[in-house]
């Protein structure tokens, strides 16, 4: 069987380098191209050398259209605007697009959904096995405990993260909302300040902390009468996201076009 040829977008960034490393280390996968933004100092450098893996004869380029020629998929942890552009290219080429980018607007998501009519797109706020298992647990717990238990989601990331709440926190919030059979957008409460009054019944609260080099900490709190349940995940190594992304690309090869999540990849979509 031929190797899965993957394009790594955002190759010069922290996650881009992790994706290159992971793809190189994974049997049956090869890095066929690597992308960086126009003007990046990484342009022209060998992707393998930049990622600390040794030379792989893949120079980093800014030409996304040329990069996807003969590729089977794109690994994309970049920015909302760029992810939308790459989704359109993936749709044209009928290839797999793995999106780990966060911070999307409704308009961004609408465009990605449109692209998924012609491409296999796996989008998730977190690609790790642990977080997606946590999401399944959160959904089940929310359903069992019911609205008498208040739900709060706390997350902490490194000081350079630019969006809040994190994509993972929103993923967990959506899981909680699904467990209760409600809409997250109608019940989310992002931060509190000043005289807020009593907590509203049914709210799902979010609090975001930023500092240091924290890869990602998430805790879902179910606070009920006389007791509190906490479900948590601590990310200690970005390679967990890289492994999940490559696993998703392997899973997506040959599937029918559509918008999928990591829950689908892990066989938890029906949970």
UniProtKB/Swiss-Prot annotation:
What compartments host this protein? Cytoplasm
User: A GO biological process this protein is involved in?
Assistant: diaminopimelate biosynthetic process
Is-annotated flag, keyword Amino-acid biosynthesis?
A: yes
Tree of life domain? Bacteria
Residue ranges of coiled coil: none
Q: Which family does the similarity line name?
A: Belongs to the DapB family.
- What protein am I looking at? 4-hydroxy-tetrahydrodipicolinate reductase
């Amino acid at each position: 069987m031929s190797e899965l040829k993957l394009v790594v977008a955002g190759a010069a960034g922290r996650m881009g380098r992790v994706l290159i490393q992971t793809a190189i280390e994974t049997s049956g996968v090869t890095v066929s191209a690597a992308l960086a933004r126009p003007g990046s100092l990484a342009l022209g450098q060998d992707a393998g050398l930049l990622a600390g893996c040794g030379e792989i004869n893949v120079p980093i380029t800014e030409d996304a259209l040329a990069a996807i020629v003969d590729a089977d998929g794109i690994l994309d942890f970049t920015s909302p605007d760029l992810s939308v552009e790459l989704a359109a290219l993936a749709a044209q080429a009928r290839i797999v697009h793995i999106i780990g980018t966060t911070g999307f607007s409704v308009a961004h998501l609408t465009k990605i959904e449109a692209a998924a009519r012609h491409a296999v797109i796996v989008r998730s706020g977190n690609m790790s096995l642990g977080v997606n298992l946590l999401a399944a647990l959160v959904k089940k717990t929310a359903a069992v405990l019911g609205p008498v238990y208040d739900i709060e989601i706390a997350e902490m990331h490194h000081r350079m993260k630019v969006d809040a709440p994190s994509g993972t926190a929103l993923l967990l919030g959506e899981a909680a909302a699904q467990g209760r059979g409600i809409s997250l957008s109608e019940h989310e409460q992002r931060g509190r300040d000043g005289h807020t009054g009593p907590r509203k019944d049914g709210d799902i609260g979010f609090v975001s902390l930023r500092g240091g080099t924290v890869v990602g900490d998430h805790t879902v709190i179910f606070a009920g009468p006389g007791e509190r349940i906490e479900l948590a995940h601590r990310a200690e190594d970005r390679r967990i996201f890289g492994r999940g992304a490559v696993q998703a690309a392997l899973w997506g090869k040959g599937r029918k076009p559509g918008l999928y999540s990591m829950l689908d990849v892990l066989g938890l979509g029906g949970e």
